[in-house]
């Protein structure tokens, strides 16, 4: 039997609120609400992101989404997906805060900030993101900005008061894994707020890799929702997140160019007494 590590003391804290799970999930791209609920339960996550515009407009696949989950047990992370400008993102963030309040989370000021004018690669706009973040912080939001893995932008967003930074591993939904490891390492090294790797993770080994880099948490949606068995993939991602976190805390051995024997090299069969 494999021993299950006790991770209860290792909490993730964002804007003064603590969470036991370091895996966040989404609500999009599932084949049914039943699959979504089963996957969220299997993941053990406590934060679930919701696209405000799609819920507000009852976009296909999002009808009744706000009522499909028990928001007494899950912390809502409204997101500004679909916003191409800072102005749009600010308006949608305000709607998201009201939506959270209507669903019983009166003190929820969280927003996942996405400003994405690029419809092909879905890469975030750094200038628009910074502009929107500055305004939303002034309005009392806990801003979790989705960004390219740009260490200077990450630091600037931290300086204006963002609650986290969320660098992408690779483009949204691409399943390409972690394509910017060096920059994520720099962001982790410099950040004084949680670093959440968001987008591009396709399977559990990539989730573990992101956590081994020192990320504080992950946000994974497509890899779970579009898996052949979403609930099983959600469980795999949860376990990988924990494994990667433990490995980072444990500290990996240094990489070397030559082998180092794990057993003593003295007293080998065939050695003369003089060399033993």
From Swiss-Prot:
Any one GO molecular-function label of the UniProt entry: thiazole synthase activity
Pathway terms, separated by semicolons: Cofactor biosynthesis; thiamine diphosphate biosynthesis
Domain of life according to the entry: Bacteria
Residue positions of the active site: 112
Pfam families: ThiG (PF05690)
Positions with a binding annotation for 1-deoxy-D-xylulose 5-phosphate: 173, 199-200, 221-222
EC number(s) stated in the UniProt entry for this protein: 2.8.1.10
Reaction(s) this enzyme catalyzes, per UniProt: [ThiS sulfur-carrier protein]-C-terminal-Gly-aminoethanethioate + 2-iminoacetate + 1-deoxy-D-xylulose 5-phosphate = [ThiS sulfur-carrier protein]-C-terminal Gly-Gly + 2-[(2R,5Z)-2-carboxy-4-methylthiazol-5(2H)-ylidene]ethyl phosphate + 2 H2O + H(+)
Subcellular location field: Cytoplasm
Gene3D superfamilies registered for this protein in UniProt: Aldolase class I
Enzyme kind, highest EC tier: transferase
Cytoplasm is among the record's keywords: yes
Keywords, sorted A to Z: Cytoplasm, Schiff base, Thiamine biosynthesis, Transferase
An individual GO BP term: thiamine diphosphate biosynthetic process
Entry-linked InterPro entries: Aldolase_TIM, Thiazole_synthase_ThiG, ThiG
GO CC terms of this entry: cytoplasm
Function: Catalyzes the rearrangement of 1-deoxy-D-xylulose 5-phosphate (DXP) to produce the thiazole phosphate moiety of thiamine. Sulfur is provided by the thiocarboxylate moiety of the carrier protein ThiS. In vitro, sulfur can be provided by H(2)S.
Quaternary state and interactors: Homotetramer. Forms heterodimers with either ThiH or ThiS.
PANTHER family (UniProt xref): THIAZOLE SYNTHASE (PTHR34266:SF2)
Family from the record: Belongs to the ThiG family.
Name of the protein: Thiazole synthase
Annotated source species: Synechococcus sp. (strain ATCC 27144 / PCC 6301 / SAUG 1402/1) (Anacystis nidulans)
């Amino acid at each position: 039997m494999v021993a299950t590590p006790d991770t209860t003391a290792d909490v993730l804290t964002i804007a003064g609120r603590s969470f036991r799970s370091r895996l966040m999930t989404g609500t999009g791209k599932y084949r049914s609400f039943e699959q979504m609920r089963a996957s969220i339960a299997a993941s053990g996550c406590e934060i679930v992101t919701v696209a405000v515009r799609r819920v507000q407009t009852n976009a296909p696949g999002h009808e009744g989404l706000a009522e499909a989950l028990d928001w007494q047990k899950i912390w809502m992370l409204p997101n500004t997906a679909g916003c191409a400008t800072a102005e749009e993102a600010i308006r949608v963030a305000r709607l998201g805060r009201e939506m959270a309040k209507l669903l019983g989370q009166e003190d929820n000021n969280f927003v996942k900030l996405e400003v994405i004018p690029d419809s092909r690669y879905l890469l975030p706009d750094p200038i628009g993101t910074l502009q929107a973040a500055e305004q939303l912080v002034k309005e009392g939001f806990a801003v979790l900005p989705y960004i390219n893995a740009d260490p200077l932008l990450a630091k600037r967003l931290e300086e204006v008061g963002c609650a986290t930074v969320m660098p992408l591993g690779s483009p949204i939904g691409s399943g390409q894994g972690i394509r910017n490891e060096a920059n994520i390492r720099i962001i982790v090294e410099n950040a004084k707020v949680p670093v959440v790797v968001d987008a591009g993770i396709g399977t559990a080994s990539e989730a573990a890799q992101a956590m081994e880099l020192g990320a504080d948490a992950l946000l994974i949606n497509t890899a779970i929702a579009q898996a052949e068995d979403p609930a099983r993939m959600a469980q795999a991602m949860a376990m990988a997140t924990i494994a990667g976190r433990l490995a980072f805390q444990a500290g990996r051995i240094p990489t070397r160019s030559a082998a180092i024997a794990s057993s003593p090299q003295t007293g080998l069969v065939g050695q003369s007494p003089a060399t033993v």
